[in-house]
Amino acid sequence: MQSYGGSVNYPPSFNNPKMEHGRNSYRRKGIDMGNIIGDPFALATTSIATLSWIIILFGSIFGFRDQNDGSNGAPVIVWPTYSWFTLVFNFFLILGIFIVIASDSAQTYHVAIVGYLAVGLVGSTSSINNLIYSGVASMEATAAGYILLSMVTIIWIFYFGSAPSAVPRAYIDSFALTKESTLPAHHMSRQTMNHNGLSSPNAYGSYNMRPETSASGLQPPQMYTGQLNGLENPARQSQIPQGFSSNNIPKPQGEGEIVPPTEYPYRAKAIFSYEANPDDANEISFSKHEVLEISDVSGRWWQARKENGETGIAPSNYLILL
């Protein structure tokens, strides 16, 4: 009877440096203005939101001055006091989003951002309803600023509320100069672990150490000769005759290699650059904006062919179908 206290000999891919890169991707850096300047979407939305807030600020100051209590016989015009709270709240909201984007931590705080944006949208729309029909120019200008800010807020809610793999967001991020080295690290963290040897836990609390390298999600059975020292299935051990080992089994020719298909009916564009794992001969490298031919779009890894005829598998969330 074998002991359950032995060590496990993991495949070499378990200690792959790419897994360390996936873990280190959560260690956020400081504020980098390049994340704002190099991202057209972030630069445009933060600029418009800041301009809208400035319009609201000056409109609120003059609108509060122009309010009338009706003592002089003029119509009663009262400034809504909660608009001051909305003004201050949106200031910290815009500042917080600016810091989050500049520090490249949107995926860490995106849930909180969407919640705060929803609160800001309610306050902005309520202020619009109370100011736009006042008949006072300063209050109407304030309402116009809130309308512009509400439009940006709705866009932000859609952007931060969508997954990085969503087609609209992936298309927007493809124009950013800095997302190439930051977004895939987080977005591919779980799939990179699956590819490098960590998939779902089994009944013994351990992990299946075989990467998914088939383009269609199906892969041939693999034979392992490393000793697991106690992680084997006892039920299967009783069915194996004595003297029988994996060394006596003839290994199929070309095991681990994927036969490339002959038809590639799909075309996809790379939204990020990808460097193939040197330990996996089935992967291919490609650069950002490169167009690949795809044979099958099912599964996490697609069988692809480059323009130079090189074939292999590519991660699906680095590509967008054309």
Curated annotation (Swiss-Prot):
It is found in: Cell membrane. One of its GO terms (biological process) is regulation of actin filament polymerization. The chain crosses the membrane at residues 41-61, 82-102, 108-128, 141-161. Residues 1-20, 191-261 are annotated as: Disordered. Disulfide bonds: none annotated. It is a multi-pass membrane protein. One of its GO terms (cellular component) is plasma membrane. Residues 1-16, 191-250 have a biased composition (Polar residues). Residues 263-322 form the SH3 domain. Residues 62-81, 129-140 are extracellular. Residues 1-40, 103-107, 162-322 are cytoplasmic. Keywords: Cell membrane, Membrane, SH3 domain, Stress response, Transmembrane, Transmembrane helix. It comes from the Eukaryota. The keyword Translocase does not apply. InterPro entries: SH3-like_dom_sf, SH3_domain, Sho1_SH3. Its main location: membrane. Forms homooligomers. Plasma membrane osmosensor that activates the high osmolarity glycerol (HOG) MAPK signaling pathway in response to high osmolarity. Belongs to the SHO1 family. This is High osmolarity signaling protein sho1. It comes from Neurospora crassa (strain ATCC 24698 / 74-OR23-1A / CBS 708.71 / DSM 1257 / FGSC 987). The lineage of its organism: Eukaryota, Fungi, Dikarya, Ascomycota, Pezizomycotina.
